Design a protein with these regions (language model features):
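C-terminal motif of bacterial Sec signal peptides marking the signal peptidase cleavage site
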Residues: 14-18
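Composition-driven recognition of low-complexity segments enriched
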Residues: 19-173
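N-terminal hydrophobic targeting signals that begin at the initiator methionine
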Residues: 1-2, 20
Length: 173
């Protein structure tokens, strides 16, 4: 009888303590879309890739193979990679100069006006990062650009595009 009472008490205690409600913990964490960052860019663009990608980023249209060949020859003939890129970029951005490539082809750089940029700096910077770097800006980058553009009212969209196109990150894919 003692054993039966003891076993009954033991089973009862185990039954009571083992049947606990399982709690589901939920935390207020927002979903976040993961995107590539610049740390994964490790391959240097060839001169032809740089020119072709720059052309598409500025005009939203691909470059003809003849123009690609000619500009590739110009790029190679200059010798200094950075000087060559700055010269080609200046020529592309100078769409109102009659001697420029853009003017001769009838191309216009697709960019917002200064007023449009100033009216929504955050969207402008996000769009520019997506356009040139194929990624979203970090919060620190976004804040830096916001403060910089608010403090320097003489900076235009052309200047921002120029700085993105000659940056080290833009050299890689």
């Amino acid at each position: 009888m003692k054993h039966t009472a003891f076993l009954l008490l033991l089973v009862l205690l185990l039954g009571i303590t083992s049947c606990k409600k399982e709690y589901i913990y939920r935390y207020g964490v927002d979903d976040l879309t993961a995107t590539n960052n610049s740390a994964q860019k490790g391959k240097l663009k060839t001169p032809e890739q740089y020119i072709a990608i720059l052309h598409i980023n500025l005009y939203n249209i691909p470059m003809s193979s003849n123009d690609m060949y000619r500009l590739g020859q110009v790029y190679q003939s200059i010798g200094d990679k950075e000087v060559a890129q700055e010269q080609i970029l200046s020529n592309f951005m100078n769409d109102d100069n009659p001697d420029s490539y853009a003017h001769q082809k009838g191309y216009v750089v697709v960019k917002p006006t200064n007023a449009q940029m100033r009216s929504n700096i955050e969207d402008f910077i996000t769009d520019t990062y997506n356009r040139f770097y194929l990624r979203y800006p970090t919060q620190a980058e976004l804040e830096w650009w916001r403060q910089y553009l608010n403090a320097h009212t003489n900076v235009t969209p052309e200047m921002v595009f120029f700085s993105f196109a000659i940056s080290n990150e833009y050299q890689y894919y």
